[in-house]
């Protein structure tokens, strides 16, 4: 579509080139060339242009129009030739775009606009915006049609680079421009009085149709902008306008489906997608958009949000197949290195969405529990989206998940007693019980290879997390807990992402600062700080796994210093700091972190009253029930979290030989949970305490029964304590190592 605009606008230079120094013959040739171009008769157009070039060899505009006509004659497949000609003409007029500083450059505006269109299709969005913004400075002298084309191109570029607020400002300018143009045409009609004829009425009808098309495009762009900003109340108003102006076209239905998806109305979103008539779409060879690929991708996003991850990955794979089929039809282009963008229509340079789809597949596979497959997808996507800190975090999470087995895997090979007894040796009087070692410190994961090699190792996870932290801006304000990633969502030809937990509690202000995180939607300031907290928590965990206790302590301390830290991450921060301090033989400092009173909340995000203050969108309430499920193995309440604190506190007291305090912590913790929920580390701690106390037989009874033996008074006294109310579940933790004793 933009290629057509480039061609049309380039040809229009004939009509606008009339000056006092031009002859009647040149005017006639120019007009004939324009009419032939608009009629699609490019051979006749080129003949007229060649005649003009013979008459006026110094006019570069004729060369420009010739290049555009030849480009259209080739069905827009000679992109490299057009690009080369535009660069030569630009060097002839100006050495750089930055030199555009006067009204004389208005004469060269068509050259720069065509160059911006080329850059747009080559995905060089920053350079295209630079050219477009220079053109926008001189927009007043432009013809109305050309001014609108410049504005629409800039709006598209702003949305592709996730600058939604700039896009909305430009759309307001466009609305005013169209409104003024409409009023001027009405005034002109009134002045002409009875002199109107059939031609003028046809022209008026054509102008009215163009205005309606422009208004419809404005409404669609507004919906895309509001979706990026997660401003659903404003989006709802614009959706109605889109449906009124564009009807049940595929773009309008895809946009409305995206809107319902963000509201949490997933069944309605699926119904809208299914109602879109994809067969009527012109096809990616004409528009550059593979609608079938978008359809399957959007279904995958919706099922991801519903928690149906296996269905989601099925649809994402279908989208990848459609994308690969489209790319196969397009071919690889010219074999000549200088013609790599030629041999296919220019609009199809934007067809390939492989890396966006790989990003989606990676996030989905991570949720399914297939971290290695997710790693392969995300490591390919990060080659393109290397500036996205959240993507680096997801890759690190793949590495962590791949190197941390489930509870069943962790006890594999330890045949009995929940992994407490490793083996039994000897017979009769010499019969001995060998206890399992629980030590996991200083594990080497990379087998001697460089940690910079992209493999799913903990060393590579540390590099990914370091990259993520470096990509975050320094400003820190108002963090709240991030609640997982959504796949990005391509609707109506654009790539968008929604995170339901974030969108439901954030208010879109005009002054909000957005941080780009392609291919996802940009991050708001609050979301950015949530991301910072998640990265710090993962960094502390990875450092502990690698035995880098000083770095782990540094990350844990930074995590605990974050303002408005969520309860779950605060809990993790204290545990990670305590584990690092114990390894550094700073037991007293570790005991301070292991105080159960530090745990007052284990929720995943900010409190409900803060969410109410941060949201003015009544529609967002439906998004709370996204269908996602938190794994059952997570501590689910303050009670279970404090229990874990007490078990670890008892371990710390043992290291200081304060066995009475350790025993008190152990039985206090055991009184708060069901006996079957007591971890094997706590059983080993009880065995260790009894052995230190000389009660060998009692220690053997604990191992035999695989449970803590209740003390005479302590346990009954502890049960009189009030039970804490359960709250939300939280993330898994790495427990500090308990001391295991092996009898000889």
UniProtKB/Swiss-Prot annotation:
<comment type="similarity">
    <text>Belongs to the CNOT10 family.</text>
</comment>
<keyword id="KW-0805">Transcription regulation</keyword>
<feature type="region of interest" description="Disordered">
    <location>
        <begin position="1"/>
        <end position="25"/>
    </location>
</feature>
<dbReference type="Pfam" id="PF13181">
    <property type="entry name" value="TPR_8"/>
</dbReference>
<protein>
    <recommendedName>
        <fullName>CCR4-NOT transcription complex subunit 10</fullName>
    </recommendedName>
</protein>
<keyword id="KW-0539">Nucleus</keyword>
<feature type="region of interest" description="Disordered">
    <location>
        <begin position="182"/>
        <end position="204"/>
    </location>
</feature>
<feature type="compositionally biased region" description="Basic and acidic residues">
    <location>
        <begin position="1"/>
        <end position="16"/>
    </location>
</feature>
<comment type="subunit">
    <text>Component of the CCR4-NOT complex. CNOT10 and CNOT11 form a subcomplex docked to the CNOT1 scaffold.</text>
</comment>
<feature type="compositionally biased region" description="Polar residues">
    <location>
        <begin position="602"/>
        <end position="612"/>
    </location>
</feature>
<keyword id="KW-0963">Cytoplasm</keyword>
<dbReference type="InterPro" id="IPR011990">
    <property type="entry name" value="TPR-like_helical_dom_sf"/>
</dbReference>
<keyword id="KW-0804">Transcription</keyword>
<feature type="region of interest" description="Disordered">
    <location>
        <begin position="602"/>
        <end position="634"/>
    </location>
</feature>
<feature type="coiled-coil region">
    <location>
        <begin position="72"/>
        <end position="106"/>
    </location>
</feature>
<dbReference type="GO" id="GO:0005634">
    <property type="term" value="C:nucleus"/>
</dbReference>
<feature type="compositionally biased region" description="Polar residues">
    <location>
        <begin position="484"/>
        <end position="506"/>
    </location>
</feature>
<dbReference type="GO" id="GO:0006402">
    <property type="term" value="P:mRNA catabolic process"/>
</dbReference>
<feature type="region of interest" description="Disordered">
    <location>
        <begin position="476"/>
        <end position="520"/>
    </location>
</feature>
<keyword id="KW-0175">Coiled coil</keyword>
<dbReference type="GO" id="GO:0031047">
    <property type="term" value="P:regulatory ncRNA-mediated gene silencing"/>
</dbReference>
<dbReference type="GO" id="GO:0005737">
    <property type="term" value="C:cytoplasm"/>
</dbReference>
<keyword id="KW-0810">Translation regulation</keyword>
<keyword id="KW-0943">RNA-mediated gene silencing</keyword>
<dbReference type="InterPro" id="IPR039740">
    <property type="entry name" value="CNOT10"/>
</dbReference>
<dbReference type="GO" id="GO:0030014">
    <property type="term" value="C:CCR4-NOT complex"/>
</dbReference>
<dbReference type="InterPro" id="IPR019734">
    <property type="entry name" value="TPR_rpt"/>
</dbReference>
<feature type="compositionally biased region" description="Low complexity">
    <location>
        <begin position="182"/>
        <end position="198"/>
    </location>
</feature>
<comment type="function">
    <text>Component of the CCR4-NOT complex which is one of the major cellular mRNA deadenylases and is linked to various cellular processes including bulk mRNA degradation, miRNA-mediated repression, translational repression during translational initiation and general transcription regulation. Additional complex functions may be a consequence of its influence on mRNA expression. Is not required for association of CNOT7 to the CCR4-NOT complex.</text>
</comment>
<dbReference type="GO" id="GO:0017148">
    <property type="term" value="P:negative regulation of translation"/>
</dbReference>
């Amino acid at each position: 579509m933009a290629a057509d605009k480039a061609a049309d606008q380039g040809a229009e230079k004939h009509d606008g080139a009339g000056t006092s120094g031009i002859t009647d013959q040149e005017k006639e040739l120019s007009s004939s060339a324009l009419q032939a171009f608009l009629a699609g008769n490019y051979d006749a157009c080129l003949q007229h242009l060649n005649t003009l070039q013979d008459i006026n060899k110094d006019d570069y505009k004729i060369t420009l129009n010739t290049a555009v006509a030849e480009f259209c004659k080739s069905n827009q497949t000679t992109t490299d030739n057009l690009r080369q000609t535009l660069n030569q003409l630009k060097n002839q007029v100006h050495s750089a775009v930055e030199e555009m500083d006067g009204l004389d450059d208005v004469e060269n505006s068509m050259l720069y606009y065509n160059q911006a269109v080329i850059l747009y299709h080559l995905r060089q969005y920053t350079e295209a915006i630079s050219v477009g913004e220079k053109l926008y400075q001189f927009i007043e002298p432009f013809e109305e049609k050309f001014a609108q084309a410049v504005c629409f191109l800039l709006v598209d570029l702003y949305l592709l680079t996730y600058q939604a607020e700039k896009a909305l400002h430009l759309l307001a300018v466009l609305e005013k421009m169209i409104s003024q143009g409409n009023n001027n045409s009405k005034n002109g009609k009134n002045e002409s009085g009875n002199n109107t004829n059939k031609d003028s009425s046809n022209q008026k009808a054509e102008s009215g149709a163009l205005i309606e098309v422009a208004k419809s495009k404005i409404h669609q762009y507004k919906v895309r902008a509001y979706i990026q900003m997660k401003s659903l109340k404003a989006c709802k108003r614009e959706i109605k306008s889109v449906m009124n102006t564009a009807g049940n076209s595929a773009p309008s239905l895809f946009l409305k489906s995206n809107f319902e998806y963000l509201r949490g109305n997933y069944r309605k979103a699926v119904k809208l997608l299914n109602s879109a008539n994809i067969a009527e779409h012109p096809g990616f060879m004409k528009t550059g958009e593979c609608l079938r690929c978008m359809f399957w991708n959007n279904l995958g996003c919706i099922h991801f949000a519903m928690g149906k991850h296996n269905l989601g990955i099925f649809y994402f794979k279908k989208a990848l197949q459609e994308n690969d089929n489209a790319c196969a039809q397009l071919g690889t282009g010219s074999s000549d290195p200088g013609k790599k963008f030629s041999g296919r229509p220019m609009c199809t340079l934007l067809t390939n969405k492989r890396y966006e789809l790989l990003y989606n597949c990676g996030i989905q596979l991570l949720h399914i529990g297939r971290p290695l497959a997710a790693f392969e997808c995300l490591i390919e996507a990060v080659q393109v989206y290397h500036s996205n800190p959240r993507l680096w975090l997801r890759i690190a999470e793949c590495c962590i998940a791949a190197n941390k087995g489930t509870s069943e895997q962790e006890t594999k090979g330890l045949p009995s007693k929940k992994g407490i007894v490793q083996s039994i040796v000897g017979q009769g009087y010499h019969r001995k019980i060998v206890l399992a070692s629980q030590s996991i410190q200083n594990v080497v994961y990379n087998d001697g290879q460089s940690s910079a090699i992209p493999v799913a190792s903990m060393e590579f996870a540390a590099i990914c997390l370091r990259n993520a932290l470096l990509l975050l801006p320094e400003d820190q304000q108002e963090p709240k807990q991030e609640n997982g990633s959504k796949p990005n969502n391509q609707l109506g030809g654009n790539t968008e992402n929604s995170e339901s937990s974030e969108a439901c509690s954030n208010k879109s202000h005009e002054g909000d600062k957005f941080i780009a995180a392609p291919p996802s939607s940009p991050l708001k300031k609050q979301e950015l700080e949530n991301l910072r907290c998640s990265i710090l928590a993962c960094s502390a965990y990875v450092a502990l796994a690698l035995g880098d206790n000083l770095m782990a302590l540094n990350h844990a301390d930074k995590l605990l210093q974050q303002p408005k830290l969520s309860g779950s991450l605060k809990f993790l921060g204290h545990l990670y700091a305590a584990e690092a301090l114990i390894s550094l033989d700073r037991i007293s400092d570790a005991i301070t972190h292991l105080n159960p009173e530090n745990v007052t909340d284990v929720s995943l995000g900010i409190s409900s009253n803060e969410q109410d203050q941060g949201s003015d969108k009544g529609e967002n309430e439906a998004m709370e029930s996204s269908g996602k499920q938190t794994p059952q193995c997570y501590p689910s309440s303050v009670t279970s979290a404090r229990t874990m604190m007490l078990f670890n506190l008892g371990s710390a007291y043992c290291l200081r030989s304060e066995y009475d305090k350790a025993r008190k912590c152990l039985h206090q913790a055991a009184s708060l949970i069901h006996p079957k929920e007591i971890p094997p580390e706590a059983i080993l701690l009880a065995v260790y305490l009894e052995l230190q106390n000389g009660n060998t037989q009692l220690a053997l009874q604990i191992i035999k029964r695989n449970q803590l033996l209740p003390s005479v008074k302590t346990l009954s006294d502890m049960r009189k304590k009030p039970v804490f109310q359960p709250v939300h579940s939280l993330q898994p933790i790495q427990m500090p190592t308990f001391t295991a004793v092996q009898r000889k």
